[in-house]
Amino acid sequence: MLQIKSISQKLITLLFFLLVNFIYANEFENPFIKNKGQLPKKVIAKVNLPGGALFIEKGTFTYNFYDQQKLADIHNHRTTDRGIKAHAFKVIFKNTNENMESFLEEKSLFFENYYLGNNKNYWAEKVHHYKSLTQKNIYDGIDLKMYSQNGNLKYDMIVKANSNPKKVKLSYE
């Protein structure tokens, strides 16, 4: 009987680690977290990055980075200094179409719930992750497609025939 219990414990432990691995693998495979009200309205999706996050808006990427070690020290009560060094910058696609469409593709099986405060208007439930995000017609005849490949975030500018790739111009803030 003891041996069966030991095997059961090993099996449960193995299943737990496989589940955790599956969840983390899916987060990197499906990095785009849909905004269902848990983020400012102009944000379409968020991507968690090592030491920060990427917020995707129409024609704009906002990167936000912070000191991971300091955050861990505060969380684990290893310091009384509550200040965290952080910085942000924006990548802006200049002169984009006002009527571009943004959509997320390939919904994950898993989801998250966000309960922000006591006001249900700020709650977001069943927030799925997605494999890719497309901003269709960001410029006339040009689409922007974002996706994850081997754990890295990528984006392609898809230029249709007879479209001018010189329209794509970026500025940084």
Role assignments for model-derived ranges:
Residues 2, 23-173:
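Extracytoplasmic/secretory N-terminal segments
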Residues 1-28:
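Bacterial Sec-dependent N-terminal signal peptides
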